Structures are given as structure tokens and as C-alpha cells.
């Protein structure tokens, strides 16, 4: 039987096209650390330069009114991974409450042993929770952790590759060696991408860089851009760190373009919590991080993909970082676990229908013996519906109208008790429908 060679050529071309059409997208998750929601070029900041993020944001679907589930890094990051709220994960604070007199930084062997035991206990809940990273790995993705990570060894949580070791006996807490990414090197990302490409394997990158987080020590060439236009040194140094973060994002994009991978890569961006620099103290916040204020809980969120996502800017619709796990799995063609209550960020009409977001605000340190008590260590719970914002604290309730008062400065609770009651009912219902997963 004589077979026409042209037939083989046609078949190879067809199979190649089919493979390209059905190939899984790569995902790069850009996660900044301690950044104010206005502090980007694409959010119209008059001075801060973020050209690389601007290009990504303007090419994708951008939600100007994104919110975190907690204005503190560890619980916020846990929500990103699990698609659950802090009161569901038992991941509410950064560190455990230590017995009186014991110090985690002590060189005393007893203190070191106690600290290690408590950190292991503190990070244990994450092992039993759903995780979009675990799900990606089980669906054939190579997964890289860089930067901040609080939950012990990332390899135990679905990462095939990790910079962080997470061992408290070796100084592991919130990222250890991983915190070198961006500030000292980008090579682990370059090497990971190159390995995945050689294996023809789809990949996910967790870029949890320790920027613009303090220390605000960006290179002098960046500080020079702001020292004469910022209102004070604290702000100038923070702004320089923001630009530094943007530069590192540009390096990732450039490498993906160099390797021909950019068009098949989805970019997702958010920040872990907000930041407003204290004017008289470098590296310290005011009325932002760890607080239920807009400068503490608001962040832009965007999803960008050259192939499938049309450029669009949403100035009104509410988005939450609880939506990110669901979105990443959906864009990869994977059904999210049923416990994830977030929506797909690519469906703005669904987010518009929801029209509300919720936030847990707990103390920095958690008493590990009191995790069954959802009110222990509670500073506030927040619901935002449309432009109305209720902050419920153990001592009272505050009501803000964010359209006319975007910095939540004017408490209107005394003037509109009916609205306070409506939003309070929504908070109660939220807690009832999102119980802890233990």
C-alpha cells in the first residue's frame, strides 16, 4: 500500500494545531506585600511609576474595588490558597501567643523548642484544607513557591518546587530563603520556567515577593526618583520599593516573552493587605495594615491573558481575594473544590450580582487554645454592600458611605440605624453560611 507523504505532513500539522489549542495555560500569580490600593500608575497615582504592572492591568480585566479577606498577611494568603475566610481556616494571626516571659527570638533552648512546637501547631490547619495549588499539581502542573509563605514546608502544600524550607528550627517563619526573590535574585523563577518548558509541562508561579514590604531599602537609583517629590522620607522610600516591585514583575514578563511563553500565560495580581506610610517613621504604617480601614483592606485585582480576556476596567464592581483560587482553577479548566465559595473573576456580571464582600480582622497573634472561639482575638468584621460599609467591632458598629467618603472618615451609624441593622443581618448570615472547616 502506497501512502502519500503529504498525508503525514497534513496530519502532523493538524495534531500540532490541536495540541496548541488544547494546551493548558501557564499561570503567574503576582502578589505584592503591604501596598496601598492607590499606589500604582494604573490607579492614577501622580508620582509612583509602575510601567510593567500598568501594561498587564490595562491589557486585562481590572477590578479597582478589590478587597482582601484580612488586612494581615498570613490569614490573607491562606484565603488566597484555600478560597476560605480566616474564620473558616483557623488561620487568623501571624504568630502564636507565647507564654509570659517566653520569646520566639530567644536563644534559650527551651524557648526555641516551645516556639517550634507552637509554630507546627499553628500551621497544621492548612494541611487539611483545600488548596488550588494542590489541585494544580494533581492535574499535572509544575508549581513553584517563591517569597512569603507562612505554612511550613511549601512542598507539603502542593508545590513541586520551593525556595522556602519553613523549618522553625532553622529560622523558618514567613518565607526564610524565599524572601530573597526579587530583592536579591530572580534566578529560581528563570530556572523553573526553563525546566518546565523543556518538559513541555504547564506551570504555576507563586511570586509572593517581600515587596514593597519594609525594609524600605530600594536601590538609590529608585529612591532618587522620589526623594524630592514625596512629602517625607518615609513615603519616598516606600514609593521606591513599589517601583522596585514593578521592575521585578517586568523581569518575569520579559523572560516569558523571550521563551515564547507569554501568550499562553495568565497573570493574576493582588496585594495581601494595604499600607499607608507613617510620615515620621520609615517602614511603619498608619491607619492601614491590620485595620478595617479602606487603606487596610482594599486592593486592585486583575486577571490578564492575551488570548482569552478582553481588556476591561471595572470601577464599581466588588471583587474579593476569596475569588482568586476559584478563578485560577477555572482558567486552567479544572473544577474548583465545592468548599471554595469564590466566584470567577472573568465573570463580572456574577460579581455584580453578588454585590458584597466580607472581611475578618483579628489580632496579630493568635491564642492557639482559643481557636474554637470565633470571637477570640477579634478586632472587627466588615461587610461592604455596594458603597455601604459596616464595621462591626466588639465595642460598637460604624457605618460609612464609600462613594462620598472613600477614606471612611465619617461614621454615619447614628444617622441610619436601619441600614446598620440590615448590614448586621448580612454579617450574621455570612458567619452562619461559612462555618469553620475542621
Please annotate each region the language model reported.
Residues 275-280, 287-289, 309-310, 317, ...:
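C-terminal cap/loop subdomain of S1 sulfatases and analogous C-terminal strand-loop tails that border
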Residues 186-193, 224-265, 308, 331, ...:
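A long, amphipathic alpha-helix that forms part
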Residues 27-28, 33, 136, 148, ...:
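A short aromatic-rich beta-strand->coil structural motif
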Amino acid at each position: 500500500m502506497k501512502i502519500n507523504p503529504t498525508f503525514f505532513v497534513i496530519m502532523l500539522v493538524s495534531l500540532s494545531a490541536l495540541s496548541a489549542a488544547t494546551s493548558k495555560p501557564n499561570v503567574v500569580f503576582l502578589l505584592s506585600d503591604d501596598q496601598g490600593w492607590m499606589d500604582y500608575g494604573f490607579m492614577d497615582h501622580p508620582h509612583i511609576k509602575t510601567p510593567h504592572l500598568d501594561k498587564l492591568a490595562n491589557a486585562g480585566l481590572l477590578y479597582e474595588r478589590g478587597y482582601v479577606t484580612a488586612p494581615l498577611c498570613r490569614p490573607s494568603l491562606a484565603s488566597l490558597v484555600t478560597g476560605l475566610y480566616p474564620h473558616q481556616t483557623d488561620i487568623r494571626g501571624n504568630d502564636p501567643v507565647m507564654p509570659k516571659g517566653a520569646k520566639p527570638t530567644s536563644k534559650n533552648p527551651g524557648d526555641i523548642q516551645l516556639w517550634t512546637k507552637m509554630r507546627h501547631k499553628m500551621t497544621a490547619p492548612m494541611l487539611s484544607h483545600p488548596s488550588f495549588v494542590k489541585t494544580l499539581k494533581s492535574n499535572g502542573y509544575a508549581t513553584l513557591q517563591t517569597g512569603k509563605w507562612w505554612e511550613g514546608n511549601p512542598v507539603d502544600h502542593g508545590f513541586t518546587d520551593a525556595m522556602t524550607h519553613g523549618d522553625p528550627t532553622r529560622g523558618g517563619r514567613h518565607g526564610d530563603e524565599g524572601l530573597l526573590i526579587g530583592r536579591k535574585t530572580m534566578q529560581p523563577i528563570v530556572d523553573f520556567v526553563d525546566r518546565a518548558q523543556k518538559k513541555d509541562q504547564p506551570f504555576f508561579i507563586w511570586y509572593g515577593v517581600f515587596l514593597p514590604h519594609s525594609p524600605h531599602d530600594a536601590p538609590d537609583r529608585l529612591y532618587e526618583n522620589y526623594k524630592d517629590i514625596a512629602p517625607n522620607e518615609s513615603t519616598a522610600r516606600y514609593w521606591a520599593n513599589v517601583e522596585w516591585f514593578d521592575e521585578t514583575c517586568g523581569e518575569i514578563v520579559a523572560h516569558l516573552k523571550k521563551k515564547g511563553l507569554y501568550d499562553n500565560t495568565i497573570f493574576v495580581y493582588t496585594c495581601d493587605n494595604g499600607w499607608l506610610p507613617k510620615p515620621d517613621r520609615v517602614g511603619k504604617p498608619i491607619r492601614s495594615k491590620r485595620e478595617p480601614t479602606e487603606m487596610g483592606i482594599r486592593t486592585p485585582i486583575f486577571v490578564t491573558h492575551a488570548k482569552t480576556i478582553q481588556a476591561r476596567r471595572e470601577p464599581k464592581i466588588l471583587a474579593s481575594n476569596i475569588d482568586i483560587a476559584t478563578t485560577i482553577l477555572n482558567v486552567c479548566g479544572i473544577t474548583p473544590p465545592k468548599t471554595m465559595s469564590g466566584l470567577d473573576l472573568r465573570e463580572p456580571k456574577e460579581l455584580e450580582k453578588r454585590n458584597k464582600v466580607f472581611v475578618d480582622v483579628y489580632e496579630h497573634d493568635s491564642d492557639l487554645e482559643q481557636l474554637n472561639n470565633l470571637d477570640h482575638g477579634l478586632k472587627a468584621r466588615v461587610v461592604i454592600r455596594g458603597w455601604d460599609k459596616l464595621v462591626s467591632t466588639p465595642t460598637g458598629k460604624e457605618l460609612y458611605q464609600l462613594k462620598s467618603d472613600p477614606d471612611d472618615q465619617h461614621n454615619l451609624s447614628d444617622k441610619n440605624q436601619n441600614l446598620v441593622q440590615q448590614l448586621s443581618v448580612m454579617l450574621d448570615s455570612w458567619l452562619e453560611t461559612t462555618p469553620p472547616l475542621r
